[in-house]
Amino acid sequence: ARKPVSKRSAEKFISNMDLNKGECLALDQVAPEPFRSNCRRCPRLVDHLDSVRLEMPEYHCAPVATWGARRARVLIVGLAPGLHGANRTGRPFTGDASGRLLFSVLAATGFARQTGSSIRLRGCRITNAVRCLPPQNRPTGTELSRCRTYLAHDLDTLWSRAVRSNRCVVALGAVAYASVSRLLDVQQPFEHGASIDVVDRLRLIASFHPSRLNVNTGRITRAMLTTIFREVRDYVDDSPHAHGASVGG
């Protein structure tokens, strides 16, 4: 069920806005920073990418940028690039099993168009809480914190007080949810299907990550993920200017 955050949380979010620019700034004392493709602020991740690059020189093996049009109304946040997925292709969720499930659901709910192996996003952007491949797919708290400035910038791009249509953040997995929640001052614990109105025209929705492990154990199914994105579709379309707005791709 939809659970609004406290009035205090919403007021704190709004108080962190630069009202002249209409942008959300310094959420949780994190200054939004545009993504840097040459970022090397996490020594452990830099060393890991260097070592993977030696074994797989054809792989991307670098920080992975957010994918999708800046004017999109939905931001999807995962955990981190997968070894043979985004770390190989350079695009979030592209090239592995979790991405195949995600993109099939996005296509079914109107957020992507698939033609053979080609994928075009429609009205959404995709990123990760950590932009570099972590060892054992487990980023440290410090690495998550260092990457949070980029996530804050993505949230700034998604929503401002000037927007006239609903915007939505979809957090895939507890770690991504925690990183987004910290920036937005959301206190609600992670729960699959949780739907939280952060401020006017901005909603956060939580889902289990569509990882191979979660799918194989039945923690998440295609039907469950489809339900999540149908709710997202209903929300972003249910606003006065949604149907006339450009959704990008």
Language-model features: locations:
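Extreme N-terminal basic, low-complexity initiation segments
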Residues: 2-12
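Intrinsic-disorder-associated, low-complexity terminal segments enriched in Asp/Asn/His/Tyr and depleted
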Residues: 16-20
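A polyanion-binding, active-site-adjacent surface
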Residues: 23-190, 194, 198-237
